[in-house]
Each structure stands twice: as C-alpha cells, then as structure tokens.
C-alpha cells in the first residue's frame, strides 16, 4: 500500500499487522495536534485524526518487524557476521509537526522542514563498525556512495563523470573523525535548501516564498526570519553557498533555475 502510512483513504483504516491492537486509542506525543498549515495540499483528511496516527504508528512498528526478519535470516544463513547492513530511507515524514501531515510533496509549495528531510542512517558490520556509536555530522544521501565504496576499499570505483557532490565519511564508520564541512543541500523540484549547524535557508523557483530559520534558537522552525532585521548577512551567505553548490552539481536538464524542466513532474512543468 505504498509508503509508510498506506495510501489514500486506507490510512484511516486499521493496519493489518500485530501492532494494530497495541496502538488502538493511544495518546501519541510524537504526533502533535496543531492547526493545519496553510500550505498543506494533500492528506488534509488525515490531519489530527486518531485513526491516521494509529495506522502510521503500527506500520512503523511493522517496518521494525521486517528489519528483525532480515537480520534473523542473515543469522540463519550464517551471513550476519560478514555482511554490511545499512538501514536508511528516501525521505522523512511529518506527523502533525508544524501543522503538516506527510512528506515534502504533500504541501504546496513543496516543503523543506526538518522532519521532511531527516532519515535514519544506521550501519552494522561486526568487526569493522563499532556498535552503539552515533555521529552528529550532517550527512546526506549523496554522501552514501563515496563513503561506502571507500569503506569497502573500492574508492577507485567512484565515477569521475558526472562530477558527484558526495563526501567520504568512511573514517567515521571506522571510529575516527573526518574532515567535515557540516552542511547539507536539498532539492525537490522547485524547492532548494541549505542546512548548516546554525541556519536553514529555503529558496523556491522562480520568486519564493523564501524561508530562513535559526536552527539553534528555533529547531522546530516556527519563526521564519527571512527579511527580518539583522539576518541579511546570514541569508546572503546561505544563498551564495546554495547557488554555488547547484551551479556545480545540478543536471542542466532538470535545473529549474536555469531553464530546465522538473525531473519528476510532481507539479506543473
């Protein structure tokens, strides 16, 4: 039934797994009840709905069961000690935070809120990756390929063309520190964003709306500081870095800022 939470009106039906009864009539602190964000364009019928919360919680726990089955199968086949296991996702999900239910393309304009961008990224490889460690570096999906290839001793397999934006965090997997610029870049069709330790800046083609958040003072992204007095130097620096990144790495065919078309056509071309 598609991504987490099912699809269509199925999200208001009970999940068909062993967790459905456990979550029935539960109060979910992780799903805040808030006024609907004016940009919410899809999933409006699920907003603040107990049934939708129960469904998403049960299906998330169902994913945990699936991971357990995979690990049990690796153990049964004698492969669990020499297999690198990576748990990741393609995108995040907002469960009522900021008044939004869903992913980045469930708002118009497309969103770049923190929970839309955050994904799990867990590695397991006994003997080579120490268990129980966490890392506070800002990393992105585009860092995955060079990091894993270097970790496996296959760094020479990294393609030279097209030029890739990914960085190598394999040192972190080995328990060392890495020379790391703590910044990530994000794009979904007409929406682009840069996230640093301190700031998140969001730009949209062709003329906004724009967003600027102080992620230290406002981690829940409640107060858009774009255009506010005193923030112009931070905005200008973020905008310049964002433009430089995509001028280097964007595929010209899909570079909306320079005449390209939308890659997935989730919104008007």
Predicted regions mapped to residue ranges:
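Beta-strand elements within well-structured catalytic alpha/beta cores of enzymes
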Residues: 4, 56-63, 67, 84-89, ...
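Long, internal low-complexity/basic segments
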Residues: 3-9, 15-28, 32-51, 59, ...
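C-terminal cap/loop subdomain of S1 sulfatases and analogous C-terminal strand-loop tails that border
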Residues: 93-105, 137-145, 149-215, 220, ...
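Catalytic-site neighborhoods of secreted/periplasmic enzymes
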Residues: 1-5, 11-14, 106-108, 182
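Histidine-centered active-site microenvironments of extracellular/periplasmic hydrolases
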Residues: 72-128, 140
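Surface-exposed alpha-helical segments enriched in charged/polar residues
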Residues: 68, 72, 240-243
């Amino acid at each position: 039934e598609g991504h987490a939470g099912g699809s269509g009106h199925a999200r208001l039906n009970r999940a068909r797994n062993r967790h459905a009864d456990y979550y029935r009539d539960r109060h979910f602190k992780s799903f805040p009840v808030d006024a609907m964000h004016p940009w919410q364009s899809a999933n409006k019928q699920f907003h603040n709905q107990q049934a939708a919360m129960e469904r998403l919680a049960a299906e998330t726990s169902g994913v945990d069961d699936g991971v357990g089955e995979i690990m049990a199968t690796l153990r049964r086949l004698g492969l669990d000690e020499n297999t690198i296991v990576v748990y990741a996702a393609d995108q995040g999900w907002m469960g009522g935070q900021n008044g939004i239910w869903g992913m980045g393309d469930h708002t118009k304009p497309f969103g770049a809120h923190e929970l839309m961008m955050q994904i799990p990224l867990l590695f397991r490889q006994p003997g080579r990756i120490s268990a129980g460690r966490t890392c506070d570096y800002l990393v992105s999906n585009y860092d995955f390929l060079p990091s894993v290839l270097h970790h496996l001793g296959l760094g020479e397999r990294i393609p030279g063309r097209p030029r890739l934006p990914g960085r190598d965090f394999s040192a972190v997997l080995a328990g060392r520190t890495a020379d790391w610029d703590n910044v990530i870049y994000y794009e979904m069709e007409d929406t682009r964003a840069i996230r640093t330790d301190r700031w998140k800046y969001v730009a949209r083609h062709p003329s906004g709306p724009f967003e600027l958040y102080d992620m230290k003072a406002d981690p829940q992204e409640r107060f858009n500081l774009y255009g506010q007095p005193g923030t112009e130097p931070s905005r200008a620096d973020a905008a310049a870095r964002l433009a430089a990144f995509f001028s280097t790495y964007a595929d010209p065919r899909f570079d909306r800022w320079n005449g390209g078309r939308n890659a997935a056509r989730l919104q008007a071309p």
